[in-house]
């Protein structure tokens, strides 16, 4: 019985949450080339929709941010030159979205932006390792 419960828990942990699945679905594009503009537009609208409907917690949104950064890195390995600029503009757009939706909660905005800064630092390291 314990083995079944442990196995069930492990399976539950491995299945992506609904927001992560939605983020993945919303960012699917044809082929391997990803349009940065499309990613930014779809991502911003996804976050805004989920927050305005109360469907996603801050933690869910942070998971989607990380997923998007990973997907962008994965799909743009051959052309890393424009990634930094893309991420910078994408982060700015996301910051504007967060402030518009969470202006009542300064701490949440600060935490979100601190997370973004860490994500950019990690993303830069990833890009450097890809281009070597």
Regions found by a protein language model. Give the residues of each.
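Sec-dependent signal peptide recognition
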Residues: 2-8
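Compositionally biased non-globular segments, especially hydrophobic aliphatic-rich helices
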Residues: 15, 25-26, 38, 96, ...
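Sec-exported extracytoplasmic/periplasmic mature domains
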Residues: 41-44, 48, 73-77, 92-95, ...
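Amphipathic alpha-helical binding modules
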Residues: 109-132
């Amino acid at each position: 019985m314990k083995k079944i419960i442990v196995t069930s828990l492990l399976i539950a942990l491995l299945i992506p949450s609904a927001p992560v699945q939605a983020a993945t679905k919303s960012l699917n594009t044809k082929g391997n080339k990803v349009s940065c503009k499309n990613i930014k537009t779809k991502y911003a609208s996804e976050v805004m929709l989920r927050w305005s409907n109360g469907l996603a917690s801050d933690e869910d949104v942070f998971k989607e941010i990380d997923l998007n950064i990973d997907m962008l890195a994965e799909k743009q390995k051959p052309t890393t030159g424009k990634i930094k600029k893309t991420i910078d503009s994408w982060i700015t757009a996301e910051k504007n979205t967060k402030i518009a939706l969470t202006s009542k909660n300064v701490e949440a905005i600060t935490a979100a932006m601190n997370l973004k800064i860490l994500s950019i630092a990690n993303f830069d390291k990833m890009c450097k390792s890809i281009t070597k």
